[in-house]
Amino acid sequence: MQFRIAFLPLVRTTFDVPLAAEMTSLARQHLQAAGFELIEPEQPVTDLPTAQQAAQEIAASPVDLLVIFQATFADSTMILALAEASEAPLFLWAIPEPWTGERLRLNSLCGINLAAHALTLHQHKYQYAYCPPQDPTVIHKIRALAAAGSLRRRLRSARLGVVGNHPVGLDSCHLDEASLSGTFGVQITRIDLNEVFTRARNIPGTVIDHTRTRLDSRLDNLSSLEQLPLRGSLSVYHALKEIAAEKNLDGLAVRCWPEFFTELGCAACGAMSMLSDGFGQEAPVPCSCEADINGTLTQLMLQWLSDAPAFGTDMVGVDADKDRVALWHCGLAPLSMADVNQQPHGGIHSNRRLPLVMDFPLKAGQVTLARLSQATGSLRLVLGRGDMLAEPKPFSGTAGTLKLECSADEFLNLLIKEGLEHHISLTYGDYFEALIAFAGLIDLPVLPITRRRW
């Protein structure tokens, strides 16, 4: 994923302008080599009028991050003009210079010190680096904050659908629409279960046949499953896909039981797996079961950060001796998460004994885990990292074995003592720092599932 950054060098002409230009050029090259798209003024920002001109250009071209490159000392009028022109997060970058006993040629550090003071007075958030232009650590910091800025911007226009209400007794799936809208800017659309059922019953047989043929190339045993409920699951996939497209929804939270079993005679799990994976779609539509809207929103966040599908799962076992946690959901995981060394299968729901669910072990690799939790009555972000292990799946359906950064016992203690929800979401890759930065941007408290502190 390429992030769009406003690169804004600040230069006071009373300092060493040639050296400042050299440092600016090196920093620019470093950012471009890292894959960032840079938006910058034709000339460095040298005074308040040029800062105001640059601010107008930024306001007309939304970006994920403002990088203020303090090429020399400058007063705070310029940084404030730039900060107030954009809602993008701020990153201040100062460069060290040798202690030569001679002229202080740039005085960059004092510049960001003054900038930080002014930004704090005016309640602007920021992060910073004090390092040479080609220091590799600065790229990691900038990438994390740009990802956070991009995520915040995209969520403000996100739309999520809730199909039905969560089952009685599953308070962990409670919808607090005002809280989600106020914190993230997302819009919620409510959808009646009967609309899904009516659409599913009216999907043309030829459409279902075509989808079945495509799915046969991914799952090797569909012909061995009971065919009527299998076709029912595929019709649910198309019904939900149509609704998401027509209502411009980025994700769905679906009351998956008991009505899909009792009214349609099939499982919704396989349909939601296909949607979450982007099967036959322009982009994945993350789906959570039990109408868990916070789970869907968490999955969408992980999907947009990783540019890959996310999965909402139960935590169903802890092996303290082996330091392992078992993750499982009926058959909901995206097919792209299947272990590449094992053929995924179509399966039947473990309790209702109806298709279609997915049946495969999760592939090995590093994962980021997250949950938008409201266990305390207000939102916070539960966040951790770990590794899915190349081990046999602990249960039928879509399942895997996880080793966390903290011990399995510590995780169990956190899960139960904090009264956390029974669902957590994951995606492959490390997006921990980006999520920490995102939480900081929106003042969202973080509960870490890790020994590490930041």
Name every feature range the model reports, one short phrase each:
Residues 277-396:
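C-terminal catalytic subdomain
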Residues 51-63, 237-246:
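Short, well-structured alpha-helical segments in soluble
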Residues 1-5, 39, 98-225:
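Cap/lid and interdomain-hinge subdomains that line or gate substrate/regulatory clefts
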Residues 213-214, 218-305:
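Long, internal scaffold/assembly segments composed of regular secondary structure
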